[in-house]
Curated annotation (Swiss-Prot):
Belongs to the RapZ-like family. RapZ subfamily. This is RNase adapter protein RapZ. The gene is rapZ. NCBIfam families: PRK05416.1. ATP binds at residues 8-15. GO terms for molecular function: ATP binding; GTP binding; RNA binding. It comes from the Bacteria. The keyword Membrane does not apply.
Length: 283
């Protein structure tokens, strides 16, 4: 497991880095006192979870030895790594001007320029010990997150999870849906007394729907649409894509179509989850 310490000058992108690490599965803590690092690591060791902790000028120990002592007392299962983010002086000034936030050292009656320079001196002990230094001067938020994934995971793209969920329109449209597809126009197994008690997960219902060309056409065209735009969605710095399929009651058609789409993208090596809202309510 890894204990990633994220530091750097204010405005260099520490919050962005912490969010990116959280998306990679790290347990993230913002501005934890250095002295508590061993305690956090011992707690997480039982969960087999890597952690990321941000340290800035506000919680920097007075002596570098305090950090070294904390590192020495980490559980053996953790490997410490220090990530330091930086940006040139003019970029930091511009970012503060854009956000209109106060610099952490501004309370010392320093000008923004002097606060940035003093912070640089205070953080030098951390910078000199960094395993990885990233200059974010020319980076966007998305580019920084992408670089971290490339450096730490060895790949550029985020593992986007596709969620296919069925629902019934009479129960309302899911508020978490990125895309909503209406399949109420497809042939309805509900009108067959033998199929009515079943769901789209049952083979007789699947066989009924599989006999209809319009069902095949809809599934094919929907998956083609998603495949066309999936690369752009994956590059949009997101973790989930939720596709909601709705029929009247959320029991037959939407369940079948959602499962068909989930199986298709799963067979293409994508991270896929499926859920069925109406069926979950019946349990």
């Amino acid at each position: 497991m890894v204990l990633m310490i994220v530091s750097g000058r204010s405005g260099s992108g520490k919050s962005v880095a912490l969010r990116a690490l959280e998306d990679m599965g790290f347990y993230c803590v913002d501005n934890l006192p250095v002295e508590l690092l061993p305690e956090l690591a011992r707690t997480l060791a039982t969960r087999d979870t890597s952690a990321a902790v941000s340290i800035d000028v506000r919680n920097m120990p007075e002596s570098p030895e305090v950090l070294e002592t904390a590192m020495d007392h980490l559980p053996e299962s953790f490997t410490p790594q220090l990530l330091f983010l930086d940006a040139d002086r003019n970029t930091l000034i511009r970012r503060y001007s854009d956000t209109r936030r106060l610099h952490p050292l501004s309370s010392k009656n320093l000008s923004l320029e002097n606060a940035i320079d003093q912070e640089n001196e205070l953080l030098e002990p951390l910078r000199s010990r960094a395993d990885l230094i990233i200059d974010t001067s020319e980076m966007s938020v998305h580019e920084l997150a992408e670089m971290l994934r490339a450096r730490l995971l060895g790949k550029r793209e985020r593992e986007l999870t596709m969620v296919f969920e069925s629902f019934g329109f009479k129960h309302g449209i899911p508020i978490d849906a990125d895309y909503v597809f209406d399949v109420r126009f497809l042939p309805n197994p509900h009108w067959d007394p033998k199929l009515r008690p079943m769901t789209g997960l049952d083979k007789p219902v699947a066989a009924f729907l599989d006999r209809h060309t319009e069902v095949h056409n809809f599934i094919y065209q929907t998956r083609s649409y998603l495949e066309q735009w999936l690369p752009a969605l994956e590059n949009n710095n997101r973790s989930y894509l939720t596709v909601a399929i709705g029929c009247t009651g959320g029991k037959h058609r939407s369940v079948y179509v959602a499962e068909q789409l989930a199986d298709y993208f799963r067979s293409r090596g994508k991270n896929v989850q499926s859920r069925h809202r109406t069926l979950e309510k019946r349990k």
